[in-house]
Amino acid sequence: MTGTNTDSDTEIEPDKYYIGVRYAAHVQNIGWQNEVSDGTTSGTTGRGLQIEAINIVLDNSTSYSGGISYASHIKNIGWQNEVSGGNISGTVGRNLQIEAIKMNLTGELSEHFDIYYRTHIADVGWMPWTKNGQISGSTGISYRVEALRINLVRKGHLHLEVLQIIIKISPCIHRNRQH
């Protein structure tokens, strides 16, 4: 909405560069869940169900060039190649859990935004927020990802939850250590 500031007659424009993120999870015994957006939980918590695949797309992706690339660490497979554009990362119909994820922004989008994400993993709960290619989840110890949240945040602005947590360095859990 465009409005007028009556104090100075300066036009106030909305953020025409708003870009959101939509994502869905394929969950054990459930299948594909409905798409959610902008920090909403996809997957389940408290039910012991693994996420087996994810897809991620931009909402209002016309403002800047670029997109989101993402990869999953899969049980018995390891890291898959990065995908983008809503393509599936993970597996469907093979009963293999995602154990960790990482995401990056590409093109002009990466110059103006950061991508923040966090996972809820078995036996641990919610991991701290990570961003821009950092690993969220576990590798080498077979803890399943059960839920995830994703947010795009304009560089220089912190999402409230992120501000409250102030990202911890490399919160991925690895065999025999956490770093």
Locate the predicted segments by residue:
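Lectin-type carbohydrate-recognition ectodomains
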Residues: M1-H179
